Each structure stands twice: as structure tokens, then as C-alpha cells.
Amino acid sequence: ETDVHASADGVAVIAHDPDLSRVAGRPQRVDQLTAAELARLDLGAEQHLPTLAETLDAFPDARFNIDLKSVGAVASAVEAVRAAHAVDRVLLTSFSERRRRAAVAQLPGVATSASGPRFAAALLATVVRGGPLVRAALRGLHAVQIPVRAISLDTVSPARIRAFHAAGVEVHVWTINEQPEMRRLLSLGVDGIVTDRADLAMEVVAALG
């Protein structure tokens, strides 16, 4: 899973935050600097902000879950995915339904997960046990990517996982960094875990066979 913003010259770059304060100690926004300027930033340990194109090229066999963090990120991410011929190995998503729809419109057939409003509608539909309503809220999607709790509800109860699966989507849970919680969620039947500790997750998956 990775987040994407657009540089000042319209290049998709891998960045979670809209500005560089946390990663580079600088107040500028990502969209105020060109891709070349961002590439010259020293993030320590000889690291820099990679572009989405560089990342897709560096890991040609990997599948990417891409969160479009800004309006400008939509067209730039679509361009990078299309240029890399990577439509079949990415999932594009956003908390914004408008951004999600825009990306899907430009990349027909690309996998996508529920935006914030679509997931909220599906979650509330599970409260009234409205199977048809859950399916309607998630129609055309491939996954829900969710925290363990939302709107004061347990989003990954066995009943809700069944309801989401019945609607034809996978259930991915974020952000899980402890192995006991990874094991618990996988035992409940979730399909994916978003984590900062891929090493720990791989140990859990290997142990489960």
C-alpha cells in the first residue's frame, strides 16, 4: 500500500503527507516542487521521494494498492500506471469518491476499493442487516479497506466480513502492526492486512501455511 501526491509539474510521487515537514523538515508542499526538485531532497540514508513510475518499474512483479491523496494525483497516477502497463497489478482508491471515480473512468477495468462515503453506507447497511443495501453500496468495487473500528462500530466482526464477502468484495484491514492482531484478523477471514511491518506479516502468513 502506498500513497500518491502530484508534484508541481504533474508527476505522481510516493508521499503520504501533503507537505515535507515530517519527512524532510521542510515546510513546502509536495505540489509546490517539481519532480526533479523532490528527487534532490535528502531524506537520510541516501533516500529520496520516488516517483510512482520508478516504483512500478523497480518492482515489476509486485501488486500495488495506491491511495490517491489529492485531486492532482489522479491524472498523474493514471499516466504512470498506464505507461508501466500495470493496470492489472494495481488497485486505485481514495477516501474521496470523486477522486476514485475519476481514476476508474480513466483506467477502465482497474481494481478499486470503497471510498469513505461508499464504505460508510455499506457499514451502516450492515447495522440493519440489509444485504441488498450492502451490495448496492459496494457495487462495482473489488474491496473494502478499513480500520478495525469506524463510527463506533466493530467493522471486522464475523457477520460484517460475511456481509462484505457476500457483496463480492475482499476485506483489507489497516494498519495492523502486531502479530497477535494479524493472526486474529486472518482467522476471522479477512483477505488482506495493511501494515508497516511486512516482515512480521510475512512470518504470520508463512506460519499459517
Please identify what each model-predicted range represents.
Residues 1, 15, 65, 194:
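Generic enzyme active-site microenvironment
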Residues 1-13:
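Short acidic, Gly/Ser-rich segments with clustered Asp/Glu that frequently serve as metal-coordination loops
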Residues 4-6, 20, 70, 178:
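Short, glycine/acidic-enriched loop or turn micro-motifs at the edges of active sites
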Residues 16-115, 137-167:
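Metal-dependent phosphodiesterase/phospholipase catalytic core, i.e.
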Residues 44-49, 123-209:
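C-terminal active-site rim and adjoining tail of enzyme catalytic domains
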Residues 94, 117-118, 173-178:
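Glycine-rich beta-to-alpha transition loops that act as phosphate-gripper elements at the mouths
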Residues 109, 114-131:
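Beta/alpha (TIM)-barrel catalytic core signal, keyed to glycine-rich beta->alpha loops juxtaposed to Asp/Glu
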